[in-house]
From Swiss-Prot:
Residues 21-35 have a biased composition (Gly residues). The gene is rplO. PROSITE patterns: RIBOSOMAL_L15. Gene3D superfamilies: 3.100.10.10. It comes from Roseiflexus sp. (strain RS-1). GO terms for cellular component: cytosolic large ribosomal subunit. This is Large ribosomal subunit protein uL15. Keywords: Ribonucleoprotein, Ribosomal protein, RNA-binding, rRNA-binding. InterPro entries: Ribosomal_uL15, Ribosomal_uL15/eL18, Ribosomal_uL15/eL18_sf, Ribosomal_uL15_bac-type, Ribosomal_uL15_CS.
Length: 174
């Protein structure tokens, strides 16, 4: 086989359709653009929301105000009234709450003070409301806050890239 024998695979190369070159070509006169209206002309087309002069739906809708805070932390809540099923004197960790099916491990958990706590429990959570903390301690238990660490992703540096502080970069005066 020589270089001049090489050919593309059948169906791999399609010839360009020459439009606007006579009615016998199948794409003559209007060149596949239909009747000659505004959409058939060259240049910018009307915006997708344009409805022919009728009041468009995008103008009928009220304006969206405000913004969505991308740093908002959404807590899963557990009321202390739900914790009466746990045996007295237990140390309730976040892993045990996940195992019970009360929370999802991907989001932080906050303990709220709705209901009555009749058990002495040591509870680990990311946050406690003031009333929940008071009721847990009144029942003889302890409320221990564990920090919520967000694992940030970076394509180049993997999970949790190091944060650079400006203080570390400034040279110390001698």
């Amino acid at each position: 086989m020589k270089l001049h024998d090489l050919k593309p695979a059948p169906g791999a190369h399609r010839e360009r359709k020459r439009i606007g070159r006579g009615i016998g070509s199948g794409k003559g006169k209007t060149g596949g653009k239909g009747m000659m209206g505004q959409k058939a002309r060259s240049g910018p087309k009307p915006s997708p929301s344009f409805e022919g002069g009728q009041m468009r739906i995008t103008r009928k809708m009220p304006k969206l105000r405000g913004f969505k805070n991308r740093w908002r932390v959404e807590y899963q809540v557990i009321n202390i009234g739900q914790l009466n099923d746990v045996p007295d004197g237990t140390e309730l960790t976040i892993e045990e709450m996940v195992a019970q099916g009360w929370i999802h491990p991907a989001k932080p958990v906050k303990i709220l003070g709705d209901g009555e706590l009749e058990r002495k429990l040591t509870i680990h959570a990311h946050k406690f409301s003031a009333s929940a903390r008071a009721r847990i301690e009144a029942a003889g238990g302890a409320a221990i806050e564990t920090p919520w660490v967000v694992e940030r992703r970076s394509r180049s540096r993997g999970p949790n890239p190091p944060r650079h502080s400006r203080k570390a970069e400034t040279p110390q005066k001698a």
